Amino acid sequence: MILEHHFASLGHAFSSKTHVQPLIEQRLVEFNQSLASFLSIDIKSTETKCILSGEEALPYSLSMVYAGHQFGGFSPQLGDGRGVLLGEVRGQDGLLYDLHMKGAGPTPYSRRGDGRAVLRSCIREYLASEAMTALSVPSSRALALYDSREAVYRETPEAGAMLLRVAQGHIRFGHFEYFFYQGKQAELDQLIEYCLEHYYPECLATDSPLESMLTEVVKRTARMIAKWQAIGFQHGVMNTDNFSFTGETIDYGPYGFMEDYEPDWVCNHSDHEGRYAFSRQPGVGLWNLNCLMRCFSKHLERDQLIAILQCYEPELQTHYDSLMMSKMGLTSTQDVHELLPALFTILAAEKMDYTVFFRLLSHYEQGEFAFLLDEVIDRERLLAWLERYEVARDKGGLLWSQASASMLAVNPKFILRNYLAHEAIVAAEQGDYLPFRRLLNVLTHPFGEHSESESLAQRAPEWGKSLEVSCSS
């Protein structure tokens, strides 16, 4: 494994030298071999094993400093309070990827915290990041999970753990906010050049590299959120310090995958105002991008920044329309626009499971209404919608069998339901990782039938519907 240290070369203004502090009696309990192969990482190597686990102190490992708007309020200095960037490795695609350890121990930015993570949160992030990747959502990845015999104190004592994460970059909107509001123009310029060189090199050849890069950041963010909305994912804490400059989903905390369709659903129990509700995510994405654009007010004219931001909504809408068109087996965005509002009204009124409905729709054969109508109380309303849907689907010119096959490839049978994560966590805390691995297997292959794992596709039982997650998750 060849570990590079490009971010460290930026200097002390951007980070602090920090070593991973291994946990008491830590052990490797899950390793992502396919991701490791892509990154040319050999876990059988003793040296590599010691580097990845933090048992070997690295000369250039670091924790990053940044700022951020948290629930609308600005925090001038945040930073990696429990994370350490080990360095970067090159993937088989020739790109560099960060290796970042969560739960690595205290850093200069821990703000009186212990810098640790608990097994519960590490399992949730491992499952979510791999599930999102399988659903074609840009996301950080999970490379390795370590548990331990070290107690970490939250509301109650919990098992300490560490998660080794992989992403194209860990630079956040908040990195730019930190230097802008500190008035550190030279460092801000340095960060801009770094991002152009490492993440957006294609923009260097344009007439206005910064303008081109920011336009691409806006579009990537729009496409990412469009995918969140299409699969029913809610991030939970859409602060600017949790938004990636490379357009990846990062920092999985009190997230959730929608079960009963509820547009104003709030998955984070700590979000008392519903600021980051499911239906508000597209608007929050634009708000965060507006915060980011302010940081370049000395580089570009106001009209240029506004024009860049105006790319967001059409990019999000176009991508969302395309995704929903595929989910519904249609070929016309006009049909999507005409059918979707009425469908969402039905799903909300019936408290229909979002994922289950679209999977059932994928199996729908022309004129065979019964199995779908059995899912609802108001059969006449759904029947009227299905009749309109049939007309739209016929217009596409595809055979119904072809359309169904395409729909089954984009409508998952398996999502990460909160109660399933809870069951996997409870078992793992007792030393049994089999439920975690069974769940991980279907989440990384969510479109298959997996008849032997049918129970993992079931809707939440009553006890599972009352589970809550918060920022401590």
Curated annotation (Swiss-Prot):
<feature type="binding site">
    <location>
        <position position="251"/>
    </location>
    <ligand>
        <name>Mg(2+)</name>
    </ligand>
</feature>
<dbReference type="GO" id="GO:0070733">
    <property type="term" value="F:AMPylase activity"/>
</dbReference>
<comment type="similarity">
    <text>Belongs to the SELO family.</text>
</comment>
<feature type="binding site">
    <location>
        <position position="102"/>
    </location>
    <ligand>
        <name>ATP</name>
    </ligand>
</feature>
<feature type="binding site">
    <location>
        <position position="114"/>
    </location>
    <ligand>
        <name>ATP</name>
    </ligand>
</feature>
<dbReference type="GO" id="GO:0000287">
    <property type="term" value="F:magnesium ion binding"/>
</dbReference>
<feature type="binding site">
    <location>
        <position position="251"/>
    </location>
    <ligand>
        <name>ATP</name>
    </ligand>
</feature>
<feature type="binding site">
    <location>
        <position position="165"/>
    </location>
    <ligand>
        <name>ATP</name>
    </ligand>
</feature>
<keyword id="KW-0479">Metal-binding</keyword>
<feature type="active site" description="Proton acceptor">
    <location>
        <position position="241"/>
    </location>
</feature>
<keyword id="KW-0460">Magnesium</keyword>
<protein>
    <recommendedName>
        <fullName>Protein nucleotidyltransferase YdiU</fullName>
        <ecNumber>2.7.7.-</ecNumber>
        <ecNumber>2.7.7.108</ecNumber>
    </recommendedName>
</protein>
<dbReference type="Pfam" id="PF02696">
    <property type="entry name" value="SelO"/>
</dbReference>
<feature type="binding site">
    <location>
        <position position="81"/>
    </location>
    <ligand>
        <name>ATP</name>
    </ligand>
</feature>
<comment type="function">
    <text>Nucleotidyltransferase involved in the post-translational modification of proteins. It can catalyze the addition of adenosine monophosphate (AMP) or uridine monophosphate (UMP) to a protein, resulting in modifications known as AMPylation and UMPylation.</text>
</comment>
<feature type="binding site">
    <location>
        <position position="172"/>
    </location>
    <ligand>
        <name>ATP</name>
    </ligand>
</feature>
<keyword id="KW-0547">Nucleotide-binding</keyword>
<feature type="binding site">
    <location>
        <position position="242"/>
    </location>
    <ligand>
        <name>Mg(2+)</name>
    </ligand>
</feature>
<feature type="binding site">
    <location>
        <position position="82"/>
    </location>
    <ligand>
        <name>ATP</name>
    </ligand>
</feature>
<feature type="binding site">
    <location>
        <position position="115"/>
    </location>
    <ligand>
        <name>ATP</name>
    </ligand>
</feature>
<keyword id="KW-0464">Manganese</keyword>
<dbReference type="InterPro" id="IPR003846">
    <property type="entry name" value="SelO"/>
</dbReference>
<feature type="binding site">
    <location>
        <position position="79"/>
    </location>
    <ligand>
        <name>ATP</name>
    </ligand>
</feature>
<dbReference type="GO" id="GO:0005524">
    <property type="term" value="F:ATP binding"/>
</dbReference>
<keyword id="KW-0067">ATP-binding</keyword>
<keyword id="KW-0548">Nucleotidyltransferase</keyword>
<keyword id="KW-0808">Transferase</keyword>
